[in-house]
């Protein structure tokens, strides 16, 4: 898939980008030269609410993975709002996926695949997949199941 088709691919997939507003005093994104840094995003829904719950307690791993996909859509929403087009993204550089889970839960990468698979659908398997960390946490803000940070390379 040609990277220039990212906006059209989002439309073809029938995906809606949720409205995202920062929940604190920080910048949701920062451009520095050819790089775009995105602050941690939670799983915002279309009605501006957040998906909540701890994976392995209130949420299954499948529900956690869907929450990570929703966090990915929130990241895309911030890109579009601040950069104008998903086609400005050359490639995904790095994701940091944080999973709010019970101590016994060990499938953090499976959860964050929800976001990684979304980005691969949007920008293709080469440009849509970067390096990644997927780690477990004892809690996250507002009891969200996932929070994901991202770094992208922009076309100059």
Predicted segments, located by residue:
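Short, polar/acidic, helix-capping and beta-turn segments at strand->helix junctions
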Residues: 1-156
């Amino acid at each position: 898939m040609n990277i220039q088709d990212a906006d059209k691919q989002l439309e073809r997939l029938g995906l809606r980008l949720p409205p995202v507003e920062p929940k604190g005093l920080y910048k949701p994104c920062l451009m520095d030269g050819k790089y775009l840094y995105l602050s941690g995003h939670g799983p915002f829904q279309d009605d501006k609410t957040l998906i909540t719950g701890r994976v392995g307690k209130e949420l299954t791993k499948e529900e956690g993975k869907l929450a990570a996909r929703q966090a990915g859509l929130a990241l895309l929403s911030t890109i579009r709002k601040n950069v104008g087009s998903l086609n400005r993204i050359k490639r995904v550089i790095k994701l940091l996926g944080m999973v709010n889970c019970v101590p016994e839960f060990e499938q953090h990468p499976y959860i964050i695949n929800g976001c990684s698979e979304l980005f691969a659908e949007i920008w293709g398997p080469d440009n849509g997949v970067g390096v990644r960390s997927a780690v477990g946490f004892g809690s996250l803000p507002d009891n969200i199941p996932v929070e994901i940070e991202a770094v992208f390379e922009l076309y100059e």
